[in-house]
Amino acid sequence: MGRFNVDMIERVIVAPCLQSPKNILHLSPIDNKTRGLTNILSVYNASQRVSVSADPAKTIREALSKVLVYYPPFAGRLRNTENGDLEVECTGEGAVFVEAMADNDLSVLQDFNEYDPSFQQLVFNLREDVNIEDLHLLTVQVTRFTCGGFVVGTRFHHSVSDGKGIGQLLKGMGEMARGEFKPSLEPIWNREMVKPEDIMYLQFDHFDFIHPPLNLEKSIQASMVISFERINYIKRCMMEECKEFFSAFEVVVALIWLARTKSFRIPPNEYVKIIFPIDMRNSFDSPLPKGYYGNAIGNACAMDNVKDLLNGSLLYALMLIKKSKFALNENFKSRILTKPSTLDANMKHENVVGCGDWRNLGFYEADFGWGNAVNVSPMQQQREHELAMQNYFLFLRSAKNMIDGIKILMFMPASMVKPFKIEMEVTINKYVAKICNSKL
């Protein structure tokens, strides 16, 4: 039994409020590489900025109809080309909109710290086993809760947009919900700016070698928050050691890599790697224009021998991560092709870790009149062994009722959550204690 139940009130197809040209749009090579559906849950509290009688479902439904005028691909359908690529047919049919009502208040969500089956009700999931031509590219569900707050569940096809692009759409939809005539940032398609050869230098091939074992322990969703105060302690220690600046993202990625390698007791003679996406919009010879909402990511990858990684310091891991980001950008700009090594091809599934960062994609800034989202979370389909969510860490902003820091949403075997958190605390406390002692 879940924490709450949701009743669907209405499901409709929302078309753009103005007709747009019916045409065919080609996708970029990166778009074709990033196929699949992604779900986002955005939580909004009741607000004194709007009247009690204000209806978020009605407001967002109308805003969706308006914003689709500027994002016509999301009102269309995908179709296969003769060579196996995808392209968008701008039909003007529309996106799916669902209005729903939950029988409890927002507190039952518990900040999405752990997975609960009832969360599945917050995103309307059309069947995925349909022909690609029949698949809706955007679904928006507004679920009101008894406290007056609500959740917006967004589902989009990743081939049409990356995370930053869908964040741009949601922000634009919020602006139109608040009375603006058009989005403040003009959406730009221009997929021809990404050339077929570009994909060769963005390191997507790292994912080609990830093969899970047959007997894979079920992953669960768990979380922890690292305060910015503690992150800044670590950054200060690193600055004292090497006069090098590291971002909060780099610090947390390094902590995760070390803690996970230790807690999973990976043999010292094996290799481990950590992969994370990098926005490449400004790395092209002609930087992609602001408003470009297609996929524009590359994959940085740091790899090392377990013995060397664990015998080294946090600074050592940080330098590997920073070098991997630099190498991705330099190789892309200089057109230096790096082919996967035999170590890549033979690496065990459990030795590969993925990290992602949703904090600054625009999801939190989508304001439909009730203020910014107070919490954001992914919503994966209920599959026990989905490869993409094994050994994965996602960075989110901590919810308003938490300490100010980075929330780490983790997907790993249940038996490993506690050992991992212990290793994280041990490493963090080492540097916090160092700073505290220096103040004495």
Curated annotation (Swiss-Prot):
Organism, as annotated: Taxus cuspidata (Japanese yew)
Catalytic reactions on record: 10-deacetyl-2-debenzoylbaccatin III + benzoyl-CoA = 10-deacetylbaccatin III + CoA
A Pfam family that the UniProt record links to this protein: Transferase
Protein name: 2-alpha-hydroxytaxane 2-O-benzoyltransferase
Keyword annotations: Acyltransferase, Taxol biosynthesis, Transferase
Annotated family: Belongs to the plant acyltransferase family.
InterPro entries with a match to the protein in the record: CAT-like_dom_sf, Plant_acyltransferase
EC numbers: 2.3.1.166
Catalytic residues, chain numbering: 158 (proton acceptor), 367 (proton acceptor)
GO MF terms, alphabetically ordered: 2-alpha-hydroxytaxane 2-O-benzoyltransferase activity
One GO BP: paclitaxel biosynthetic process
Pathway entry: Alkaloid biosynthesis; taxol biosynthesis; baccatin III from 10-deacetyl-2-debenzoylbaccatin III: step 1/2
Keyword Phosphoprotein: no
Database matches in PANTHER family: ACYL TRANSFERASE 4
Biological role stated in the UniProt entry: Catalyzes the conversion of 2-debenzoyl-7,13-diacetylbaccatin III, a semisynthetic substrate, to 7,13-diacetylbaccatin III.
